[in-house]
Amino acid sequence: MPHKVSLSRLKLTDFRNYAAAALDLDGRHAVLTGDNGAGKTNLMEAVSLLSPGRGLRRAAYGDITRVGAAGGFSIFAALDGMEGEVEIGTGIETGEETTARRLRINGTQAKTADELTDHLRLLWLTPAMDGLFTGASSDRRRFLDRLVLSLDPAHGRRASDFERAMRSRNKLLDEGRFDPSWLAGIEEQMASLGIAMALARQEMLGLLTRLIEETRETSPFPSASLQLSGFMDGQFTRPSVDLEDEYAAMLSESRYRDAGAGRTLDGPHRADLIVHHREKAMEAERCSTGEQKALLVGLVLAHARLVGNLTGHAPILLLDEIAAHLDEGRRAALFDLIDGLGGQAFMTGTDRAMFSALGDRAQVFTVADGKIFE
């Protein structure tokens, strides 16, 4: 069983609808119940900001601060992490550039948010993701990259460096500055980073596919088959150096085409995650809404198991409205599966009775008007 990473305390100041709030946890799962709009998802969002990035809502930091607050917002968390007990603080202050946030780990200023992955890994599932299979390919890429990031913390830096290099190339092409040596240098950097990104995605999907196959008979959810499409399809068994050379040549040959288009038309930023319902042999986008939700839940929980298996530390799960629209039997099976992962899960719902099958495996809190009651 993987080591259980768990929060023991969460404290918020001027975060969303919370002027001040504290949550004391005993290591069990945490169930947050209350009316819609009470602030349950806001608590989940605060926990999600203990990982790199902008959290489960991807909100601008300035928008997170409570309306009417004199300063910025702050989040404090104490947890039993991957390297032992740790305290994490993050937030912004009044007048700060709100594209970045401050981060302190055990009282020391962190150099980058990537340091958070030394202490915990987070996965989440929200109602906003229900349209993942029918929505824009950019949403699926973002979802895929978060899955990769939980196994390969360097992936986020590679992706941001690739985007930065691509913007530089696009700017040069837009300005008509076709300096061969300058562009070649940028394109070589894009090739190195882009192929590394694509290989990391392929490796993660291969590992996840094998785990789904191994647990197919025991999972209460349908099995997903996964593949990438849209960038050098079928080529990733070749040596990476050959792939880098080919992609760099592709970029060089497409300069005038990309200049006309106003963007780079080939690369990992154009790839798409293709998901099929294995039992039905059907593309996920053609499945019913309920089947899509079941596929997505099964996929996220399978990935959580993979993270625990490979890192030795179970991820913390944030499952917003996870029990909605499930019958009693499937809810019980879901809770058993979550509990069997060996980690701590935060779950929300409007009805406390929906979580009765958890029994004493969870602390249950009521959220109302920016207040939390156990």
From Swiss-Prot:
- Residues binding ATP, per UniProt: 34-41
Predominant localisation class: cytoplasm
- GO biological process, alphabetically ordered: DNA replication; DNA synthesis involved in DNA repair; double-strand break repair; SOS response
Q: Detail the disulphide connectivity of this chain as listed in its UniProt entry.
A: none
- Which lineage do the record's taxonomy fields give for this organism? Bacteria, Pseudomonadati, Pseudomonadota, Alphaproteobacteria, Hyphomicrobiales
- Which Gene3D superfamilies does the record associate with it? P-loop containing nucleotide triphosphate hydrolases, RecF/RecN/SMC, N-terminal domain
Q: What does this protein do?
A: The RecF protein is involved in DNA metabolism; it is required for DNA replication and normal SOS inducibility. RecF binds preferentially to single-stranded, linear DNA. It also seems to bind ATP.
Q: Does the keyword Cytoplasm apply?
A: yes
A GO CC term? cytoplasm
Q: Which PROSITE patterns match?
A: RECF_1, RECF_2
Q: Quote the subcellular location field of this record.
A: Cytoplasm
Q: Which family does it belong to?
A: Belongs to the RecF family.
Xref: NCBIfam families: recf (TIGR00611)
Q: Which Pfam families match?
A: SMC_N
Name the species this protein comes from: Rhizobium leguminosarum bv. trifolii (strain WSM2304)
Q: What is this protein called?
A: DNA replication and repair protein RecF
Q: Which UniProt keywords apply?
A: ATP-binding, Cytoplasm, DNA damage, DNA repair, DNA replication, DNA-binding, Nucleotide-binding, SOS response
**HAMAP family in UniProt:** RecF
- Molecular function as annotated in GO: ATP binding; ATP hydrolysis activity; single-stranded DNA binding
